[in-house]
């Protein structure tokens, strides 16, 4: 492998939505930082078999924040 072209690969902590924490190696963040998940396999409808959750401040909120003042009326 070439030196100096690859991102730093280090240990981080990942906090699941139920509060459990595990360590893994990643290029995200800095050594020892904690990545807090908003959705994970314990809460995602695809793995739990539940119904789909409504937007929790995600895409729809971003769209409304960005384009909320626009109107199609002339």
From Swiss-Prot:
Cross-referenced InterPro entries: Ribosomal_bL28/bL31-like_sf, Ribosomal_bL31, Ribosomal_bL31_A, Ribosomal_bL31_sf
Signal peptide: none
Gene Ontology cellular-component terms listed: ribonucleoprotein complex; ribosome
PROSITE patterns given in the database record: RIBOSOMAL_L31
Single annotated GO MF: structural constituent of ribosome
Entry keyword set: Ribonucleoprotein, Ribosomal protein, RNA-binding, rRNA-binding
Keyword flag Cell membrane: no
Keyword set includes RNA-binding: yes
Gene Ontology terms describing biological process: translation
Role summary: Binds the 23S rRNA.
Classification via HAMAP family: Ribosomal_bL31_1
Quaternary context: Part of the 50S ribosomal subunit.
Family: Belongs to the bacterial ribosomal protein bL31 family. Type A subfamily.
Protein name per Swiss-Prot or TrEMBL: Large ribosomal subunit protein bL31
Naturally occurring in which organism (per UniProt): Novosphingobium aromaticivorans (strain ATCC 700278 / DSM 12444 / CCUG 56034 / CIP 105152 / NBRC 16084 / F199)
């Amino acid at each position: 492998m070439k030196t100096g072209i690859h991102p730093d690969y280090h240990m981080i902590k990942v906090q699941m939505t139920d509060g459990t924490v595990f360590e893994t190696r990643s290029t995200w963040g800095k050594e020892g930082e904690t990545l807090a998940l908003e959705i994970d396999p314990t809460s995602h409808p695809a793995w739990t078999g539940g119904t789909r959750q409504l937007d929790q401040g995600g895409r729809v909120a971003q769209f409304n924040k960005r384009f909320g003042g626009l109107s199609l009326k002339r």
